[in-house]
Amino acid sequence: MKYLVAHRKAADDPGFPGPNGGAPRLDAVHAAWMVAVLFYVIAAFHAALVLGAPWGALTQGGGGSGPLAASGRIAAAVSCVISVVMANAILARIGRGPLGVRPSRLATVLAWFTMVYAVIAVILNLITRSSAERALGAPVSLVLLGLITW
């Protein structure tokens, strides 16, 4: 978390209190890339749900099997967009991705939002009625939270 979320200064700022002459730690960079890849995979999962994939039991409380209803597809589309934005926000914290090559205030706020989102995702995936969703979603969200707070 120290490098992915908390710091606002650019990696090339000589006053940046980090190792390697101010660059983000290598393990934080790897964690950011892993978080981004996981969020892109989650976004692809939600995009597949929007397109009619029969994975309704794995999402949204596992209320239905097969393809999602129209309202569920709208929720999946929103989740898809949110996942892509969060992946890009985490990449921006290490100076990569489409949100800019330098960390910005927006990227910092979005990175904090991503951490809060991950905490909520862990809780919701642990308390869901769907055993399939709990078996898939809980470990993925726990890994995401662990990597985000790395």
Where are these regions (language model features)?
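Short, intrinsically disordered terminal tails adjacent to the first/last structured region
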Residues: M1-P19
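Interfacial loop at the N-terminal end of multi-pass membrane proteins
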Residues: F16-A32, A48-A76, R96-G100
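Hydrophobic, membrane-facing alpha-helical anchors
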Residues: D27-V37, M86-I94
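Hydrophobic alpha-helical transmembrane segments of polytopic
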Residues: V35-I42, A75-I82, L110-Y117, G137-V140, ...
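C-terminal TM-helix exit segments that contain a strictly Trp-centered aromatic cap at the helix terminus
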Residues: A43-A53, S83-I90, L124-T128
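Mid-chain, well-packed structural core segment of small domains
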Residues: I90-L124
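Membrane-water interface at the C-terminal end of transmembrane alpha helices
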Residues: L144-W150
